[in-house]
Amino acid sequence: MSVVRSSVHARWIVGKVIGTKMQKTAKVRVTRLVLDPYLLKYFNKRKTYFAHDALQQCTVGDIVLLRALPVPRAKHVKHELAEIVFKVGKVIDPVTGKPCAGTTYLESPLSSETTQLSKNLEELNISSAQ
């Protein structure tokens, strides 16, 4: 019985920026789950890519989307930065769309003031109608 191993040539990759010291280049670490055929258990496999960041907008810790280039820009740079999915420290819950830190939602003081003002206005409208 032979095990067929396929290499992944992904055009789009999501990873975390681990370095930005090179000019217009971001060092991105991508983690994939790989099945061990003997143990039948998945293990993390990490790979590091270099991506062209023309505007130098990445910072260490950002979650980014990379696009494969048709022709490599350099010996190691074979991808370009397509989009910053999440900036470091500015995580937004995909279900509610609210900013969060860990398991708690962050509310700005302005949003809490506007909710209090809207409640006060609703009370005033109800009392004036009666």
Curated annotation (Swiss-Prot):
Family named by the database record: Belongs to the universal ribosomal protein uS17 family.
Gene3D superfamilies per UniProt: Nucleic acid-binding proteins
Oligomeric and partner information: Component of the mitochondrial small ribosomal subunit (mt-SSU). Mature mammalian 55S mitochondrial ribosomes consist of a small (28S) and a large (39S) subunit. The 28S small subunit contains a 12S ribosomal RNA (12S mt-rRNA) and 30 different proteins. The 39S large subunit contains a 16S rRNA (16S mt-rRNA), a copy of mitochondrial valine transfer RNA (mt-tRNA(Val)), which plays an integral structural role, and 52 different proteins.
Gene Ontology annotations for the cellular component aspect, listed alphabetically: mitochondrial inner membrane; mitochondrial small ribosomal subunit; mitochondrion
Stretch forming the transit peptide: 1-20
CDD domains with a match to the protein in the record: Ribosomal_uS17
Record protein name field: Small ribosomal subunit protein uS17m
Cell compartments where the protein resides: Mitochondrion
Species, as recorded: Homo sapiens (Human)
Domain of life according to the entry: Eukaryota
GO aspect biological process, one term: translation
